[in-house]
């Protein structure tokens, strides 16, 4: 496992495996990044602080994914649903988003509408609708009218809830919506009604709409701050109509009454389950990227301040205590 980590980090950063191993060894021994960069160049092969930090970050992320995979495998194993093929796929996946998509159908859920419908015995009806061969689904649904299922429409609604959850957990469907968000996601912000005066400093964002991928980090962070303060309502949305059409092309294979039931379930799935889930994903990712970019800008600005002459034209002598008992003096 550790050697696999070394290979992946090496491929991602373009740094040799030997340098990765040596650097991680120093970090595991408790050495700090500045110390390694300054005093252990002969061990790391001359890596600078940025490269060492990247190695550390990649290693920590891989460790987190490995722990998550262990939890996922144990959970699915306890359900008795872990096949050899599924286990192999999980073990070979190192993309966190894909890993969570694979796990989603097996993830323990609170009592959803679909789960309530299953408990009413409506899953066979949902399967029948998905096949889209039955010309009279209402007649078949009548067989399920008993107990908590009050009428035919109640049975069909429960079956649609099951189909909607199935659509929302389908990897291809999720990637389709995810790609739409990535290509055409629009960030929209509107001031909360009645908070106009309190939100004066955010007036530039009272009614704004722009492409998420083109939104600058400082604007995105300002909008998210205002949202956290309860002053703006913020949303991210792709072309809803196009997304639904793509999903219908994937799941709806007939114009008969069963196909119409599936189409209705697909529309519900997108609006109620898929879109909110992917929107949350993109909100988190875009905020993280904006934070990283802001940190880089602040770090560079601070670097310029620290490099500025503190005393103008006056002479300055600096003393650097070396790792050995020696010291180096510089007169500027």
Regions found by a protein language model. Give the residues of each.
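Generic start-of-chain signal for non-secretory N-termini
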Residues: 1-21, 28
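Generic structural marker for isolated residues within well-ordered, non-membrane alpha-helices
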Residues: 6, 33, 113
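N-terminal cofactor/phosphate-binding cores enriched in small/glycine residues
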Residues: 18-20, 24-39, 43-44
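Short, small/acidic-rich helices and loops at N termini and domain boundaries
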Residues: 44-46, 54
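Duplex nucleic acid-engaging cores and interfaces of nucleic-acid transaction enzymes
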Residues: 51-54, 61, 65-310, 315, ...
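Short hydrophobic beta-strand that contains or immediately precedes a catalytic carboxylate
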Residues: 318-319
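Single conserved hydrophobic/aromatic residue that forms the stacking wall/gate
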Residues: 323-332
């Amino acid at each position: 496992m550790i050697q696999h980590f070394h290979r992946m980090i090496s491929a991602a950063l373009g740094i040799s495996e030997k340098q990765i191993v040596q650097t991680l060894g120093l970090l595991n021994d408790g050495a700090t990044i500045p110390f390694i960069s300054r005093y252990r160049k002969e061990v790391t092969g001359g890596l600078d602080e940025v490269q060492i930090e990247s190695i550390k970050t990649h290693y920590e992320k891989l460790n987190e994914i490995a722990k998550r995979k262990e939890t996922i495998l144990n959970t699915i194993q306890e359900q008795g649903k872990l096949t050899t093929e599924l286990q192999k796929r999980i073990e070979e996946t190192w993309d966190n988003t894909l890993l969570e998509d694979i796990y989603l159908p097996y993830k323990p859920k609170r009592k959803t509408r679909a789960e309530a419908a299953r408990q009413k015995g409506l899953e066979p009806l949902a399967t029948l609708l998905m096949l889209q061969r039955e010309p009279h689904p209402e007649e078949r649904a009548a067989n399920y009218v008993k107990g908590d299922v009050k009428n035919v429409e109640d049975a069909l609604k429960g079956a649609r809830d099951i189909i909607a959850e199935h659509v929302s957990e389908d990897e291809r469907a999720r990637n389709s919506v995810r790609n739409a968000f990535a290509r055409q996601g629009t960030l929209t912000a509107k001031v909360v009604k009645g908070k106009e005066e309190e939100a004066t400093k955010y007036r530039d964002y009272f009614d704004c709409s722009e492409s998420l991928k083109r939104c600058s980090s400082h604007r995105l962070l300002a909008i998210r701050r205002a949202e956290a303060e309860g002053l703006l309502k913020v949303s991210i949305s792709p072309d809803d109509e196009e997304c639904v059409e793509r999903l219908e092309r994937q799941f709806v294979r007939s114009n008969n009454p069963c196909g119409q039931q599936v189409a209705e379930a697909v529309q519900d799935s997108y609006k109620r389950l898929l879109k909110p889930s992917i929107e949350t994903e993109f909100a988190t990712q875009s905020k993280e990227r904006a934070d990283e970019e802001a940190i880089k800008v602040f770090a560079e600005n601070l670097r310029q301040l620290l490099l500025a002459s503190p005393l103008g034209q006056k002479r300055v002598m600096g003393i650097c205590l070396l790792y050995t008992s020696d010291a180096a003096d510089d007169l500027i």
